[in-house]
Structures are given as structure tokens and as C-alpha cells.
Swiss-Prot record:
Protein name: Glucose-1-phosphate adenylyltransferase
Biochemical pathway: Glycan biosynthesis; glycogen biosynthesis
Subunit structure comment from the entry: Homotetramer.
Induction: Expressed exclusively on media containing carbon sources that allow efficient sporulation.
Family recorded in the similarity comment: Belongs to the bacterial/plant glucose-1-phosphate adenylyltransferase family.
Length: 380
């Protein structure tokens, strides 16, 4: 049962900034890119990187996510020895142990890690869009003889205060770390991807659990303490597309990025496929009167109107004389006739009646997350 590396995937986030999209599901279960869920990218990275043992830590609204993951067969992670294991909070004698932070969620599942006695633990977040070979990061970690390796990316200075920010020497050794600083001194951001030497991780998680002043978070507590105690932390520089889709705006932007001819995120690469659960829908139907351009249209869609620069998930119907522009239409949405949709995200299963106009009244560039209340208001 011993494994060289076990991945722990944090997938319990509420995603409150995504508003109505996460009302009934955790953020990693939100649809993305015409046929995927956000978590597909991290799970596919694991599969493509040869990581065959993944613990998925869930908490907020887990039903949709649990049903989607199943036994992990979509990502070739339905293994007898290892594979995918969903790890929800659990009751221990007198109380339920809810996860209090990112570090707490790993600590509460030390028994899961103990059974594999790995050399390394890879800690991942299930709510980012990117392609990455974790095997190369592990090789880097071993080469640097690091205690901890953090994957890092340069972000815009205007965004830096949203991330864990660090400074590193030319050889990659991390010298300074601030979690979401108000006035960042660097734009080198943590991607929330860590490789720990297992004995060290276990030791510091046990120490952290005994600290009544800790918030039990990797960025706020564990990483600063490791630096303070002179452990060797290395920064692994990531080059490529990476998007934190934690807001309605950023989720829309990431979907629109897929439609660029020179997009950094290439879904059609054979060498690094992104796997998902097949929706088992019939082929899409595009009528002779329809016009579709620069768009992703998934299985089961029926299009009679005009669709431009948009992403349509499975089971979407677009009525006659309807125009959909620069929008993301989630699964099983029905759009009536003579409807106008611009710069919007339409959530799962919504029905838009004939004549509805869906666009922002304030700003032509603002992305609108459509709600039932908005549709009712438009029809008054």
C-alpha cells in the first residue's frame, strides 16, 4: 500500500463570490468550458501526471460533487490500490469535526495518509483552471532537497493582494511569505499547490492542531512557521495558463479565453487531455436558419437562433430569432424566441421566456449572472 506521493485535493469551498452558481453545490462542481466541471482540471492533471492516489476533501454542499466524482473512473482513478477517496468531515464520539481551515482538513485525515505512508504529499486546490505536470514539480522538489515546494506564478500587481505573496532567491529558495498582504512587496503568488515531505507535514499539522491561536491555514499559519524555523522552502515557477475562477467576472473571462485562436489553455491537445463525465446526450442540432460562430456548442444542444462568441453546455435550446453574444449558457437551459443575451452567465436549468432581454443596464462591459428575479423583473 505504500505510495511515493499521495495527493490531497481541497474541494470543500463555498465559493461565495460566485453567488447563485454555488447555492446548491461546492465551487469545484461548477460547470466550465462547455462540458467540464472546475475540478476536472485538477483531477485530469493528477491522472496525466501519474498521481494515482487522491483524497478529495469535501464539506460545503457536497452532494453534486460526490455524485459527479463517483469512483473516479472518468479520470482513470478507479483503482484497487489507491484511486479516488472522498473524505468528508466526520463524527468522532461526541462531536462532528468540521474542517476549520486548509491545514485542519488535512490533519483530520492523517489516518488516510498513514495507510499509504508516502514519501511526499501533494496538496491541491480544486477550484483553479490550469494544466500542470505535477511529476515535474515533484522532480524539482527532490532535486532542490526542499522540505516544502510551493508552485508560484507572477500575477498582476493589482491582483497581488488576493494571494499569498512571496520573495525568493535566484535559486528558488523562498525568503519571505505574506498571506494576502494589503501592500504587496512582490507579485510572485502562491498557486495553492504544495509538495511536503510527509514526516515534516505530519509533525507541523500535529503542532498546529495544539495551537489555540492558529487559524489552521497553510498560508496564514503553517508556511510562515516553517520559514520562521528555517526550513527549506522552494518556489517552483509555473509558466502557462492559470486562472482563479472565484468570481463571476473571472469565471466568464476564463470561458471566453477558450474562444481565442491563440488561447494559452488548449482543450484540443491530445497529449494532455482534460477528462470529464460524459453527459450521454444526442448530437447537437443546428437549424438551417441558425448562425453559430466562434463558439463551443456541446452535445444535446438545439440551436435555431444566432450564437456568437459564446459557450453552450449540454442540453441547451436556443429559440428562433434569439441572439446570444459573449455569454456562458450552463447545462439544460431553455431560451425562448426573440431573446437577447449579452455578456451574461445563465445558470443551470433556467428557462428564459420569449422576448427576454438579458444584459447589464449599468455597464456594457459588466458580466451579468442571470437570476430568476432578474428575469421576472424584465417581464414586468
Amino acid at each position: 500500500m505504500k505510495k511515493q506521493c499521495v495527493a490531497m485535493l481541497l474541494a470543500g469551498g463555498k465559493g461565495s463570490r460566485l453567488s447563485g452558481l454555488t447555492k446548491n453545490m461546492a465551487k469545484p462542481a461548477v460547470s466550465f468550458g462547455g462540458k467540464y466541471r472546475i475540478i476536472d482540471f485538477t483531477l485530469s492533471n493528477c491522472s496525466n501526471s501519474g498521481i494515482d492516489t487522491v483524497g478529495i476533501l469535501t464539506q460545503y454542499q457536497p452532494l453534486e460533487l460526490n455524485s459527479y466524482i463517483g469512483i473516479g473512473s472518468a479520470w482513470d482513478l478507479d483503482r484497487y490500490n489507491g484511486g479516488v477517496t472522498v473524505l468528508p468531515p466526520y463524527a468522532e464520539s461526541s462531536e462532528v469535526k468540521w474542517y476549520k481551515g486548509t491545514a485542519s482538513s488535512i490533519y483530520e485525515n492523517l489516518n488516510y495518509l498513514n495507510q499509504y505512508d508516502p514519501e511526499y504529499v501533494l496538496i491541491l486546490s480544486g477550484d483553479h483552471i490550469y494544466k500542470m505536470d505535477y511529476g515535474k514539480m515533484l522532480d524539482y522538489h527532490i532535486e532542490k532537497k526542499a522540505d516544502v515546494t510551493i508552485s508560484v506564478i507572477e500575477v498582476g500587481w493589482e491582483e497581488a493582494s488576493r494571494f499569498g505573496i512571496m520573495k525568493a532567491n535566484p535559486d528558488g529558495t523562498i525568503t519571505h511569505f505574506d498571506e494576502k498582504p494589503k501592500f504587496p512587496k512582490s507579485n510572485l503568488a502562491s498557486m495553492g499547490i504544495y509538495i511536503f515531505n510527509w514526516p515534516l507535514l505530519k509533525q507541523y499539522l500535529e503542532m498546529d492542531d495544539q495551537n489555540p491561536y492558529s487559524s489552521h491555514d497553510f498560508g496564514k499559519d503553517i508556511i510562515p512557521l516553517l520559514l520562521e524555523e528555517k526550513k527549506k522552502l522552494s518556489a517552483y515557477p509555473f509558466k502557462g495558463y492559470w486562472k482563479d475562477v472565484g468570481t463571476v467576472q473571472s469565471l466568464w473571462e476564463a470561458n471566453m479565453d477558450l474562444l481565442k485562436e491563440d488561447s494559452e489553455l488548449k482543450l484540443f491537445e491530445r497529449k494532455w487531455k482534460i477528462y470529464s463525465v460524459n453527459p450521454n446526450q444526442p448530437p447537437q442540432f443546428i437549424s438551417s436558419d441558425a448562425q453559430v460562430q466562434d463558439s463551443l456548442v456541446n452535445e444535446g444542444c438545439v440551436v435555431y437562433g444566432n450564437v456568437s462568441h459564446s459557450v453552450l453546455f449540454q442540453g441547451v435550446t436556443v429559440g428562433k430569432h434569439t441572439t446570444v453574444t459573449s455569454s456562458v449558457i450552463m447545462p439544460d437551459v431553455t431560451i425562448g424566441e426573440h431573446v437577447v443575451i449579452e455578456n451574461a452567465i445563465v445558470p443551470n436549468g433556467m428557462v428564459l421566456p420569449d422576448g427576454a432581454v438579458i444584459r447589464s443596464e449599468k455597464d456594457i462591459e459588466e458580466v451579468l449572472l442571470v437570476s430568476e428575479e432578474f428575469v421576472e423583473k424584465e417581464l414586468i
